[in-house]
């Protein structure tokens, strides 16, 4: 059985989020939580919260046991980009892209 959790419009670029997502893919939930707590990346905190939400969904909605779960799939998609301008010399302006991410985690108890 599976349980899912989604996180939308997180203000971290998808490229940086994927680095963290790749470290916990196909790992046991307990190992993934320990990994995320010790990871020195800004993207680790929102992914840890999302993983805890997926585990809570599995336990409360489907009656699964938390210690038997593993991260079946995790993927990061690109959200809408906020476009800003930075003034530069001689009347120019550089465009600044503030990228957002959408993250989906699926946990399962079947290998």
UniProtKB/Swiss-Prot annotation:
Q: Which GO terms describe its cellular component?
A: cytosolic large ribosomal subunit
Gene3D superfamilies listed in its UniProt record: Ribosomal protein L22/L17
**Gene Ontology BP terms:** translation
Pfam families hit by this protein: Ribosomal_L22 (PF00237)
Q: Which UniProt keywords apply?
A: Ribonucleoprotein, Ribosomal protein, RNA-binding, rRNA-binding
Citing just one GO molecular function, the answer is:
structural constituent of ribosome
User: CDD domains under this entry?
Assistant: Ribosomal_L22
The UniProt similarity line reads: Belongs to the universal ribosomal protein uL22 family.
Q: How does it assemble?
A: Part of the 50S ribosomal subunit.
Query: PANTHER family from the xrefs?
Result: CHLOROPLAST 50S RIBOSOMAL PROTEIN L22-RELATED, LARGE RIBOSOMAL SUBUNIT PROTEIN UL22M
Function description: This protein binds specifically to 23S rRNA; its binding is stimulated by other ribosomal proteins, e.g. L4, L17, and L20. It is important during the early stages of 50S assembly. It makes multiple contacts with different domains of the 23S rRNA in the assembled 50S subunit and ribosome. The globular domain of the protein is located near the polypeptide exit tunnel on the outside of the subunit, while an extended beta-hairpin is found that lines the wall of the exit tunnel in the center of the 70S ribosome.
Q: What is the name listed in the Swiss-Prot or TrEMBL entry for this protein? A: Large ribosomal subunit protein uL22
